[in-house]
Amino acid sequence: MTQPKALAFDVGGSVFDWKTSIHSAVKKLAAGKNLPIDHEAFAMAWRLQFFVQIKRVHDNAIPHVNADVLVQAALEVVLTEFSGLEVSDQERQGLLSAWHQMKSFEDFPPALERLKEKYKVYVLTVLSFSMVADSSKVSGITWDGIISCEFLSAYKQRPEAYLEGCAVMGLKPEEVAMVAVHPSDLNSASKTGMKMCYAEPQLQEPDVPGLSMPPEYDNYFAWGKGFKELADKLCGINA
């Protein structure tokens, strides 16, 4: 199998720990209001509703807006689910800022630095450009490029997102490996000709109909239990 020239990283849940960031924001809100709020349930509901909003974009039910607009719409739905929870504009902004302050998983930055010696490293994400730029700065990591689906004609996991993302990189799909913890993301990328690299997830995601599925290890170009192991294999493969 030919070697990829570039790696395209999913980041939400793969590289960045969205859950801990939202937990912190919800705990701060709960402390300020002196209310018991189930931060785990809130975070999972918000993440799930984010995917619901993306599906609405896929279905042409709403315009192709960026993830900041989508997570705000998702938040409004979640707030109605937590009856009796009223938030001010300032508190709402405090919650939304969590998506711009996500930290990377601990094993990722050193793995990324090693991978940069062998490959171009890009982000290909449903998150907004500013979410990724801000969270990358928080985590002290840099990329060769950030490709947000807000600039493409479709969101992942539509094929257009992967094809257009590769075109932005100036590469053919078969020259790029998608890196993610979500098997459905990898499968969708593979259908366009991209290679698949899998890292086992470090947090639990909500069960999203049509998106949640088990990994298919035999079909992956490389996989690891974490990013260190994945980087070991990718650097060895390309040696």
PLM features per residue range, with description:
Residues 24-28, 45, 73-77, 94, ...:
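Alpha-helical elements of Rossmann-like donor-binding domains used by nucleotide-donor carbohydrate transfer enzymes
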Residues 34, 40-43, 47-93:
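A metal-dependent, Asp-based hydrolase signature
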Residues 1-4, 113, 124-239:
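Asp-based, Mg2+/Mn2+-dependent phosphohydrolase catalytic module
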Residues 1-48:
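Active-site neighborhood of HAD-like aspartate-dependent phosphohydrolases
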Residues 64-72, 85-123, 159:
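Short, acidic loop-to-helix structural element flanking the phosphoryl-transfer center
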Residues 22-30, 46-50, 71, 95-99, ...:
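Hydrophobic alpha-helical core bundles mediating ligand binding, dimerization, or RNAP-core interactions
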Residues 35, 117-120, 194:
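A generic structural motif
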